[in-house]
Amino acid sequence: MDYLTDVTGRSSRVLRGTVNRLWYGHRQVRFQDCLQDVQRENMARPPQALRSDTGQRKTLEKKDGRRMSFQRPKGTMEYTVESRDSLNSIALKFDTTPNELVQLNKLFSRAVVPGQLLYVPDPDYISSVESSPSLSPISLLSPTSSEAEFEKRTDTERMPHKESTSSPAYSTTRQSRVVSSTSEEEEAFTEKFLKINCKYITDGKGIVTGVLLVTPNNIMFDPHKNDLLVQENGCEEYGIMCPMEEVTSAAMHKEIVNSKLKDSIPVDVDQLSCMREFCHFKKISPGNLHDLDSKMWDAGNDSASTAPRSTEESLSEDVFTESELSPIREEHLSSDELRQDKSSGTSSESVQTINQNISECSVNISDCADASDDVKGSLEPSGNDSGIVSSINDLERSESSMNVGDGLDKDISESSIVLTEANEGQAESKGSKNNCNDGNLADNQTGDQNHSREAAVVGNHRHEALQEKTLKQSFGDSETEAEELRKFWKDLTMQQAKQQREDMQHTTQKEIKGKMPTAETHIEGVCSSVAKEKRRHRTHRYLCLRVGKPMRKTFVSQASASMQQYAQRDKLEYWFAVPHERSDHLYSFFIQWSPDLYAEELGESAREPGFVVVKKNEEGESSDRSTNDSASRLWEVVSVAEYHRRIDALNTEELRTLCRRLKITTREDVNSKQATNIKHDQEPESFRPNLSDPSSLLQTEQIEKLTKHLPPRTIGYPWTLVYSTAKHGMSLKTLYRLMLGLDTPVLLVIKDSDSQIFGALASEPFKVSDCFYGTGETFLFTFCPDFEVFKWTGDNMFFIKGDMDSLAFGGGGGEFALWLDGDSYHGRSHTCKTFGNSILSKKEDFIVQDIEIWAFE
């Protein structure tokens, strides 16, 4: 140890030169001669301290000699490893991969220790070339959609950030070596895959948000665990993966062109807000008019005053948004307001409506009049806005009705001037409140001008009677006069309110009945215009992937995935809604990182790209692809095999068109016509198998229908009657005994007491088993009332289950699709997930009359 402390400056220079030769010349390596500092400190300390601190100095020397701090790459931030962190968990926190963290931090292994400083991708970093369609590392790695950025920000806010701070003593005395990072390595690594936040549009199972991962070898979609459909149905339904060599076509569309998939989606995402408002308005039916009037009346009485206001909103943005229209405001839409909306919809000006402010309380009549004057002044009638003039007339009638209330309040105040100051204040506040109620009723009233005049005359007569009564009792006791005045005023107000309410109900009912079709038509037109406007600024494009084999489920076992892949063998098209700015990234990725076709005989120079861009004039199969498909498609890349197939189909179609134009009959056309005729002649005979014994349950037509759905390995073999209740009796044990030695599918035919024919095809002979057995060839059928076949759905593998006392087909949810007891006498049929069937018989429980089992050998 003393030898280590006596290292001279010459040995330090030799060590530094050796390290410089080991590291590349383009990297700037700077060492601080820490050993000299340690030597000076040791000379100043006593020998005992040197001996006791030998282990600590050795550890410090190793740490200082190996300390490295890389220059932080662009788009990254510092993160300190915590006690329970691993490289995988850190990558999951920052929405990246462990391999990327290894590349960014130049790690030699995936092991991390608490307190270690790592560079992780910064979610708030915005690249200057992000808007470019070229494949930059940041644009490829980090999603650029607003939804993805919002999710990343929320995740980083929840996660505690710890800045690594070095000790001041070490920072002044030591200099760490700085290794400059090479951006070529990160670019070469990060450009090899795309990670896009998108939505998977399923066929009948909803739309799920998740991450689409595109690599040169695979395409995989992982759903978000926070999605409502994922929480309800589980990840097994939505996680899919496909090898890149199975992709035959990748196309980007403006809208979904698959008619079946488009019909299964309820409404476009951009039209949801508009349609919600329209559906809410359509709930106002003539049967609900009475409830509507009640709500209007209660709202008017609960509020102390009405403050008409003018709201200026844009038709294309806020008129039909859910945040602006509250349920109370929707219920207060009158026919005049609908007329205003319709008349102003043809012009470019904003819509101005008059509405009630129910939330304000205790506002006097002068404020209401001022607000009415403001609204009246702000509504300037134009040539096209004829509905606004009628609204101004309604305001004038409302003000005239309010003036009647003002005069009535004035006379009452003069007649009761002898009251005390306290009673006078109570009477004034009571009168002011009732004045506001009268004004509210008059403002809500939608009758004509004659009805308003009649209401004013009635109010004047009652006002005169009230004035006479108050003058006669003016010399009585002041408190008694106040109580009687309040009581009489209350009775008068209730009678007048009841009459006005009845008149208003009749008038409002007639007007809303007349204006309902017009209002619905207007709102539908506005919704369509809003939908068209938003369609221009749609933020999503639709990626259509066509594959040669169905995609595999990623969250199930390999056996289940293979079985489900076989069950969904007809599903060869998948749709994803991706952000529009990622369309160019996908296009460039498919062109650059496509799998190659290796031609061994021609060598390395004969390689062709795995995907080829399809041009407009190279589109074959015009009958299969509609004009709408070509119009909405932005771009499409196909595999080389698909490209050659389309070119051949296009050339064949052009040749046929030319022959048709020249009226030339080719040999293929003649052969196809002859083959069609022969097929029609021989079709009944080809589907009529040979039976070893005549069937007492199946007719000839029923046998032909069943033969069309049998597995291919049964075609051409004669039908052999293995078991029949007429010959062998009704015993399940006898059935199992007769099945021994068979190795073919078997057909079970049942006839119940209602003379209904149904049954099942089993992929294997019936036997006693501990669990379910069979394959996806198993299916159910029924002739009750019409012929129908129920194939395997792929949800589970509960095909056949044999016991000594029962025989069952299908399962899931505690119910069997078809069940027979040990005596083959009682049976039951129920819907199940295995086959997605309905009840095979007329009733759920049935009695077996006869059974036949046929084998194919």
UniProtKB/Swiss-Prot annotation:
Keywords: Mitochondrion, Stress response. Residues 190-249 form the GRAM domain. Gene3D superfamilies: LysM domain (3.10.350.10). Belongs to the OXR1 family. It is found in: Mitochondrion. It comes from Xenopus laevis. SMART domains: LysM, TLDc. GO terms for biological process: response to oxidative stress. This is Oxidation resistance protein 1. InterPro entries: LysM_dom (IPR018392), LysM_dom_sf (IPR036779), TLDc_dom (IPR006571). Residues 54-67, 149-164, 327-342 have a biased composition (Basic and acidic residues). Residues 343-353, 381-393, 432-449 have a biased composition (Polar residues). Its main location: mitochondrion. It comes from the Eukaryota. Residues 696-857 form the TLDc domain. GO terms for cellular component: mitochondrion; nucleus.
